[in-house]
From Swiss-Prot:
NCBIfam families given in the database record: gatC (TIGR00135), PRK12821.1 (NF009461)
Gene Ontology CC: one annotated term: plasma membrane
Membrane topology: Multi-pass membrane protein
InterPro entries membership: Asp/Glu-ADT_sf_sub_c, GatC
Source lineage: Bacteria, Bacillati, Mycoplasmatota, Mycoplasmoidales, Mycoplasmoidaceae
Protein name, entry field: Uncharacterized protein MG098 homolog
Family: In the C-terminal section; belongs to the GatC family.
Gene Ontology BP, a term: regulation of translational fidelity
Localization, UniProt: Cell membrane
Pfam family, any one: GatC
Entries under Gene3D superfamilies matching the protein: 1.10.1760.20
Keywords from the named record: Cell membrane, Membrane, Transmembrane, Transmembrane helix
Keyword Transmembrane helix: yes
Length: 479
């Protein structure tokens, strides 16, 4: 009996101290990376990079919109669920923080780590004020770390975009993304095992086991099993990234020009017999890789390693209970990040790419070969305006100088061949003789990108209409 009374018990303050140390280490590491990147830019590119986007009405509006949406989600849930959500947010503030972090990730990914810090702190303060929840400094620090991690992912993408070789840029971004996931796994393992071993020594247990004791669920794991689950999750994420990269390589090899970097789809048009190059913007590789990297990294470093420390302060449960609870709900949190963040980024991709292009191209030296995206924006209007003319070499050189990069003679010749191939597909269409062909009034749209705006006059029985067409002329159907 005396043994039980005198047995030392783990103190919550000791665990929270470890959390503050964890925050300080990760914060210093992220700031050190930003400092190293800035020095690298100064040494190689002779310029100081900006870690925040240009302040403007559009960016400020978007940041405010993201903050407002994050706060509104919490308030809407409280209104729909009545007192249940309010009681849940007050009894378990970690649930509220988990919802907040989704929008914090989007803000950091769009605008960088500095804006991510500001958005995270603002979102947490406002949700506590309007929802009447429990304020905990640990949750604020967790949101700040999430915004910084998302912002670092943006900085990595900007850094790899400076490489003039597209394949090298894609591979570098893949390697850095995998490195972030592996680093998050190692940090989580080291931190969780360190705290658990300390608690095991305090309790005097021979084996420290994680126990989840809910009214209808009794579940427990050893530390070894817990570590293996995190390891298998990390391996699965890395394999998914590699498969995504292989699919991207195979797809872009057939759907892009090497030098001009036009992405295209080649298909037989429904209204004529010629094949057209339809220029598209294929950004799905970076978008999906962004979401997977961000979701897995924040899940490991924040939801599993950091937040359970402060869950013990706001609830009556132990640290090992929240470790296991967060692990059990990890698949739901991961899928929720993917489902919510991906479509939002899909809508905001033009804004994100605009920020990337601005950060890459501003004050860039002419000797540095930047992405041909800027050249596309200048050349495409000329192609559309003068489809029947071939771009002259002197004109292309002038456009290249206007977009701040130099071309060798060999690159110039290859680039001209690519532009010629692109414009020839339009030239063939321009030469179609349609003087004796009346417009086709189709009952439905027969092409994803029609050349003409055909008028729909028949809504029923389109099969009979096409089967009984009067004549065919140069690929056109006359009805």
């Amino acid at each position: 009996m005396d043994k039980l009374i005198n047995k030392p018990q783990p103190l919550t303050s000791d665990i929270s101290t470890s959390g503050f140390i964890y925050f300080a280490v990760v914060f210093v590491a992220i700031m050190g990376y930003l400092l190293f990147k800035n020095l690298l830019f100064l040494f190689f590119f002779k310029r100081y990079p900006k870690n925040t986007p240009k302040i403007g009405v559009g960016n400020i509006t978007t940041i405010a919109m993201i903050i407002a949406v994050a706060v509104s989600i919490v308030l809407v849930l409280m209104a729909l669920a009545g007192g249940l959500a309010a009681a849940l947010f007050r009894g378990y503030p970690g649930f509220r923080v988990t919802l907040e972090l989704i929008l914090v990730k989007i803000s950091g990914l769009l605008f960088g780590p500095i804006v991510g810090i500001f958005s995270a702190a603002t979102i947490d303060f406002l949700t506590v004020i309007f929802s009447g929840g429990v304020f905990n400094v640990g949750y604020v620090l967790g949101a700040i770390l999430t915004g910084m991690i998302a912002g670092i992912l943006r900085e990595v993408l900007i850094s790899t975009a400076l490489l003039h070789n597209r394949n090298l840029s894609d591979f570098a971004y893949l390697v850095l993304s995998i490195g972030m996931v592996i680093a998050a796994f190692l940090i989580t393992q080291f931190f969780v095992l360190g705290i658990s071993n300390n608690l095991k020594e305090i309790k005097g247990d021979e084996e420290f086991r994680l126990k989840f004791n809910a009214p209808s669920i009794v579940f427990e794991l050893s530390l070894t099993q817990y570590a293996n689950i995190l390891l298998y999750f990390t391996i699965a994420i890395v394999i998914a990234m590699l498969v995504l990269y292989i699919v991207w390589l195979v797809k872009q090899r057939h759907l892009s020009f090497e030098h001009s970097r036009f992405f295209y789809r080649s298909y037989k048009h429904a209204n004529h017999q010629f094949t057209l190059f339809v220029l598209t913007k294929e950004n799905w590789f970076y978008l999906i890789l962004n979401v997977i990297t961000l979701a897995s990294t924040s899940l490991l470093m924040i939801n599993i390693a950091f937040i359970p420390i402060f869950d013990t302060q706001t609830t009556g449960q132990t640290y090992e209970f929240w470790l296991l609870a967060r692990l059990l709900f990890a698949p739901v949190i991961f899928l929720l990040d993917i489902i919510v963040i991906y479509p939002i980024l899909l809508l905001l991709t033009p804004l994100m790419l605009k920020g990337f292009k601005t950060a890459v191209s501003k004050n860039q030296r002419k000797t540095l070969k930047q992405s041909f995206t800027d050249l596309q924006s200048v050349v495409l209007p000329i192609i559309n305006k003068r489809k029947h003319q071939q771009l002259r070499q002197e004109e292309l050189k002038r456009l290249a100088r206007a977009t701040h990069f130099d071309l060798t003679e060999g690159e110039m010749e290859k680039l001209l061949v690519e532009f010629k191939t692109i414009t020839q597909s339009f030239d063939r269409v321009m030469n179609i003789d349609t003087t004796s062909v009346e417009p086709m009034y189709a009952p439905f749209n027969t092409s994803p990108t029609p050349l003409r705006k055909d008028k729909v006059i028949v809504e029923k029985h389109p099969e009979k209409l096409l089967a009984n067409c009067k004549e065919m002329s140069v690929g056109f159907v006359k009805v």
